[in-house]
Amino acid sequence: MRRGAAWALLLAAALGLGARGVRAAVALADFYPFGTKRGDAVTPKQDDGGSGLQPLSVPFPFFGAEHSGLYVNNNGIISFLKEVSQFTPVAFPIAKDRCVVAAFWADVDNRRAGDVYYREATDAAMLNRATEDIRRYFPELPDFSATWVFVATWYRVTFFGGSSSSPVNTFQTVLITDGRFSFTIFNYESILWTTGTHASSGGDADGLGGIAAQAGFNAGDGHRYFNIPGSRTADMAEVETTTNVGVPGRWAFRIDDAQVRVGGCGHTTSVCLVLRPCLNGGKCIDDCVTGNPSYTCSCLAGFTGRRCHLDVNECASHPCQNGGTCTHGVNSFSCQCPAGFQGPTCESAQSPCDNKVCQNGGQCQAESSSAVCVCQAGYTGATCETDVDECSSDPCLNGGSCVDLVGNYSCICVEPFEGPQCETGSYVVPSPCLSNPCLNGGTCVDADQGYVCECPEGFMGLDCRERILNDCDCRNGGRCLGANTTICQCPPGFFGLLCEFEVTATPCNMNTQCPDGGYCMEYGGSYLCVCHTDHNISHSLPSPCDSDPCFNGGSCDAHEDSYTCECPRGFHGRHCEKARPHLCSSGPCRNGGTCKETGDEYRCTCPYRFTGRHCEIGKPDSCASGPCHNGGTCFHYIGKYKCDCPPGFSGRHCEIAPSPCFRSPCMNGGICEDLGTDFSCHCQPGYTGHRCQAEVDCGQPEEVKHATMRLNGTRMGSVALYTCDPGFSLSVLSHMRVCQPQGVWSQPPQCIEVDECQSQPCLHKGSCQDLIAGYQCLCSPGYEGVHCELETDECQAQPCRNGGSCRDLPGAFICQCPEGFVGTHCETEVDACASSPCQHGGRCEDGGGAYLCVCPEGFFGYNCETVSDPCFSSPCGGRGYCLASNGSHSCTCKVGYTGKDCTKELLPPTALRVERVEESGVSISWSPPEGTTARQVLDGYAVTYASSDGSSRRTDFVDRSRSSHQLRALAAGRAYNISVFSVKRNTNNKNDISRPAALLTRTRPRPIEDFEVTNISANAISVQWALHRIQHATVSRVRVSVLYPEDTVVQSTEVDRSVDRLTFGDLLPGRRYSVRLTTLSGPGGAEYPTESLASAPLNVWTRPLPPANLTASRVTATSAHMVWDPPTPGISLEAYVINVTTSQNTKSRYIPNGKLVSYTVRDLMPGRRYQLSVTAVQSTEQGQLHSEPAHLYIITSPRDGTDRRWHQGGHHSRMLRNRPAPLRLPELRLLNDHGAPETPTQPPRFSELVDGRARVSARFGGLPSRAVTVRSQPTTPVPLKNTEAPEQARLALQLPKNNSKDTESTPGSCSEDTCQNGGTCVPGANAHSCDCRPGFKGRHCELACEKVPRPCTRLFSETKSFPVWEGDVCHHVYKKVYKVHQDVCFKERCQSTSLKKLKQESN
């Protein structure tokens, strides 16, 4: 191409010229494979529905965040975070977590036509195809390899309001990732509709017009988004003809970063990189159709046009309702509402309910100038704030407990009651025999009115309480009358059946004799003799019965001068004082026999089937053969029987079965129908099931579009109330649906849009347009206002486009169009090349109403009419490129030059340097070019900074008055190439630049915010950290720094990023250390900063040393005295913790004395084995630090002896025996000494120590220390000298091994040593035990144990003193305070050594 023609082509591209792709689309064969045969799932055929949450096998990065699940929505989008049922697309950006990938967001209705398929794919064929596509469309990522693909396909779907014959669309979304980068590919096969017919979308019957589909990406934060060109405009019908990757109908994007990046051309074929034609922040997208380079501008919201150069007038659609005034802004509008209206578009009339908040679902109802809350069932109060307690009326019966619910209650019934109010059921009467009323081994039998006791031989009575008397048991000297009878003749003063009762002494029965045969009468504690002799008295005498002379319940009958006693049955005598036993009172007749007395005898009349004196002999039982079936009860008659059948059965032997309906199998009032061997239940309304056991449940009713539903349940009689959205009214009289007895809901209502135009509100022949919850008047020319009541200036609406000027006329206007535009509104761009103005073969290029002739070589001029080339003389020299135009030339200067003919040198800035480096920014500075002339030439500086991998690039312009700049929004830990150019701005929008001043720097990596200490000992600290896969992706090394105590020099260690833990050893015990972490990025030794800010220091204390040389100096039956070395100089301890452990429990004692070097443990049990441990406690500002415990094992002495055992650490057990002196010890000889003592020795006391290894040490009091050696033959005896000084002698005796022939094996001996792993056998009284080496446990030391560290919390007690005044004396009160301290605990894990050895041998 010739030079002039090349520049013309570039100029044409800058003006927005250049061919778009021809009508094409991606064939279905070029889609990623889909369909049920490929294993795809299909979304439900539901309006505005979707797939529900689909968990992902790998996280998917999107806008800088990772997502583990997604939703495939029927309306053409894939959403994260939550499902999106919005069917009318909303302009991006959108907040409220609307995180979406939109291939074609519109009102899809797959119920009418089409399917929505989706699947997650990781097979090799899909991954290979995705890898090839991404490497082709993003050549800067040649090493990309896909590991996961998700495919969603909307196949032949139609729009809401369409039918099976309406136009259909097919498009596809493909998500691809390798775990780090993520991409989206959109494939469009046919796009025949863009809009649904719902009123909010505004589409026509063909699915066109109104608010068209939205395509692009939205981060959900209200800020970040990306639109595919044509979104929400009629151009979406042509989306299958556009592309950014050279394939019409296919778009590819990278979407893992904070901003969407488009795929496309290389640097050599990119129009966007050369011209940058998009204005007002628009995103330039190369179309990259092979052989025809072109571009498309993705405009920010609020701008439109080929180059995003036109500001969208949001007021043109008259969004403000009810007379509101619209004010236009950039990508926005605002409405100034008239009085009585409110809302973003003045759509809502102000109501008293605007400031009334009804709680708990209450609905506000305006009444004149006030507002009232209509509460939901179960709530009351002015704002429905009070929950009604439905349990206050005690609705639950039969002991049921009531649970208050919202608008209802529930009864929890006790068995056997049930029902909504526990009203159904009855108590089961317990058997009277459950209390075992029969005594003395009697058998209880249930009866109709109670129970009957069958008594064993020798007992009788209702509960077998009375014993049958076979012999005479008369008491108090009574005499038995007759054989085998119970009649006793009692001596004077006693009465009763067995003469068991003593007659009470009274004044009249103590041998008192009245003269003349008079009778005695008690009177006032004395007696009175009533004589037979007549006496004349004038006053009344007391009655003879006043003294109550009759005993034992006898009744007194008074006569004139005497009385008689009428005795009760069983007594006789004048005063009823003599007992006559009732022979039948003892119940001698058994088995229901009737007792009758005859004189001094009784006779038993026996019932059927019994005989004998006492009816004790049974007759044959006719019921013994069990003739009654089905649980019938057999009753005896004289020679006969009768069956008492259970309910439902009949017949002589209860052999006839009841009807299937007998037991009332139908529940809840159902009517039972007998079907012979089966039954059928006719249920009451509201119940269903074979036995009417289930309530009718209609399920969840379907939603009604444009309506809000309130539901009080799904059982029969439940009601679903529907409230139409504003602007809609019910199509039927009822606004509710009722759950019917058949288990289905009644017919739903429909919300039909209200036609507010029926009242003809528009004046002056204005036409009314119905809106949702309102209307809009389209006024006739010359009128305006809410109701077209005002005459208007037609030019106020700015009807003239493309810079045309408006002239107002009565009821009309005229647009005076600028050159290049025609039409009523100057809307049509004139094809300036239609008249072929270019001469001499010049090529005409149209642009914005004007034309440009690209002249062949040798011609120039506006129409190529001049045959001369102003550039022939090379006016620009070698410093620029010459371009001829209209007989003149212009120079495009090369880098480093400027001026009309590029004669001035444009010098770069000097002394470029980095001032400060942060995680997301870099501050740089420079010096202006040297020389006054060089400084005056430039207009400013261009600062270009790009990441070293080429993933991002930005250029900022800096005024020439400044010499520093802050680069922002950089990625942490990345290397950036920074170039600063001197810039000279020209009038033709072509800028001249100098050579760059460049440098390479790297931002700081992100620090490690969280790291932890995993283990602490007396001389080591272990720390652990974690690097985030994305946030620390640029970190190459980690520096761990430690500041030692009393040292100002920080010691550091650097480790590779693969290392996540480090242990510092050789530390001092009980000291504080400060640990810091710093991340490093970039190669080592780089000259620019590569390290992050240091993390906050973590102060850690090492543990103090455990007490050293812990020993037991004295062990008794109930105590043990321990001693240990003082702590290391320079370490100040606060306390010690003494733990006493047995096989059953552990007791801990806190001793608040850090200088303690000994302690006596008391209250021990004799002859028991104990583990004693001592832990040192050091106090720090972080709390208390505990050392590892020092252990000591002891065995206390038995009470009848003073033997003691202990062992220290891993040493063998020792046993200390204190032996009393023998009664007489005249002489003690040692085997290796000579001579005899001069004087008889006194009885010495000695102690011997058995250490469990067949060695004995003995200590003698009052003897010199001499060694004893065991020899095969004894040597000459050596006498021991007896001295008065308390000197001691030690004898070390080597005991023979247990396998000696003369060793007797006892149950507690160690003759058979079963201790494993080096354990030492310790003999005992009844059995031996094993003293295990450290690291082993078990009865035979068969378990290998290790301590595993883990973080834990410890509860420590601390004794503090508080000064208290009492009177004039100050003293201290000690109080124990408990603290919780974070610590590292050790959990012991044991494993059998035999099992461990077996595993090692198997490996």
Curated annotation (Swiss-Prot):
Biased composition regions of type Polar residues, renumbered to the chain: 1305-1314
Signal peptide positions (record): 1-24
A single BP term in Gene Ontology: cell-matrix adhesion
Gene Ontology terms: cellular component: extracellular matrix; extracellular region
Disulphide-bridged cysteine pairs: 272-284, 278-297, 299-308, 315-326, 320-335, 337-346, 353-364, 358-373, 375-384, 391-402, 396-411, 413-422, 433-444, 438-453, 455-464, 472-480, 474-488, 490-499, 545-556, 550-565, 567-576, 584-595, 589-604, 606-615, 623-634, 628-643, 645-654, 661-672, 666-681, 683-692, 698-739, 724-751, 757-768, 762-777, 779-788, 795-806, 800-815, 817-826, 833-844, 838-853, 855-864, 871-882, 876-891, 893-902, 1310-1321, 1315-1330, 1332-1341
Domain Sushi: 696-753
Domain Fibronectin type-III: 908-1006, 1007-1105, 1106-1200
Gene Ontology molecular function, alphabetical: calcium ion binding; Notch binding
Tissue expression as described in the entry: Expressed in liver.
One Pfam family, short name: fn3
InterPro entries assigned to the protein according to its UniProt record, in alphabetical order: EGF-like_Ca-bd_dom, EGF-like_CS, EGF-like_dom, EGF-type_Asp/Asn_hydroxyl_site, EGF_Ca-bd_CS, FN3_dom, FN3_sf, Growth_fac_rcpt_cys_sf
Name used for this protein in its record: Sushi, nidogen and EGF-like domain-containing protein 1
Phylogenetic placement of the source organism: Eukaryota, Metazoa, Chordata, Craniata, Vertebrata
